[in-house]
């Protein structure tokens, strides 16, 4: 029983390493606890169970706030909302369980190799699986804890997954020091931090002379109001009012996801009208909207204004690729659809865009866009960044989750994308956090949550491609796979020798 509560406790501890708490050492302590309780357990099955319980403590505390949207907007009572969160947490807990099984089976001996190579390689593989299987859900990899920590300088080189790799090594060295009663592993940790900390002051980019005035509008429209068809005109007027106030002082105006609460066809007259006004002022508007293409609906980003006339089939458009499971896309549709129909739940089923898409072209600026939680898929973002990319853009609607910690977690993961790519990131969110993030991941300016306001800044383009944009996770993933292939053959050899 003590081991069960210990596993849950250490898993729960991890959440305070992320925003809004930002106590980054908590992730090291949390992983230290996971490694201690599983390496101290000689039975593989029992170790896997403890890994699963650590995952429950970790993921339930990290994503509990999803119940707000399930309860308030889908009409599911609180009890069943919590059950759904537990089921999702249980699914996500399979990945730390895989991590424990891999380390226990392939690296049974408690030594330097286990904690410096075996455990971090196993973690890398389990996290890659979490980001790929089904729709993928790489929410809060432990590397995100370092956005304000001493290892953040590694992000432009090895990305958030690489930082996670290093954190597993550091936690592992703490465990090794505990078991061996030796200070040498601690010296190794000091060596790692001493070696990597100066990277925090190194710039992988240079600032161009090219800049533009950008305005980000935060409408702060409640989700209840947004889904009310009688409020559509009022919501649009709210955004128009602020837009007219700043149109003379900004070149690019950005509205968030769901700013236009109707599809592109239904709002065509409104779009043509505002497009005309923008052209007179020689400004651009970038906004989220639902688009219809070949009988399929897409969550998309469109551009208005500029030199070309507005067309609903314009190529200067973006279609969301990573759709939110259950919110925008029903996974395992053939199995789950009949169940949801019996429960009387009608879910949206959008079509996803292509993995690779053109950058948005605004004046002579090239912008890599993303919508909502797509910003957590760092590998896809970096694959769409080109040598001529000027900015990253993400638009979101976090009003589904109220004043919980969810929007803050989301915001800090966006900061990591700016740091990994060396690009300014523009973030417009319906109710916050609307902000401009610098190419070093630092906050340039932001609006408070839950206000109806705008952010107006001159933003400079940056030049340069970081090592992470070039190579991604490939070097570390390749190394991890090679480690397991070698370990597998060693394991087979030992079995034969034993027999």
Swiss-Prot record:
Q: So where does this one cross the membrane?
A: 18-38, 50-70, 82-102, 105-125, 156-176, 182-202, 476-496
Q: Which membrane topology term applies here?
A: Multi-pass membrane protein
Show which residues constitute the signal peptide.
none
Annotated CN hydrolase domain ranges read 217-461
What pathway does the annotation place this protein in?
A: Protein modification; lipoprotein biosynthesis (N-acyl transfer)
> What Gene Ontology terms describe what this protein does at the molecular function level?
N-acyltransferase activity
Q: Name one Pfam family in it.
A: CN_hydrolase
Sorted alphabetically, which SUPFAM superfamilies does this protein's record hold? Carbon-nitrogen hydrolase (SSF56317)
Main localization of the protein? membrane
List the disulfide bonds in this chain.
none
Q: Which domain of life is it from?
A: Bacteria
Q: Which PROSITE patterns does the record cross-reference, listed alphabetically?
A: CN_HYDROLASE (PS50263)
Subcellular compartments? Cell membrane
Name recorded for this polypeptide: Apolipoprotein N-acyltransferase
Q: Which organism is it from?
A: Wigglesworthia glossinidia brevipalpis
Question: Its encoding gene is what?
Answer: lnt
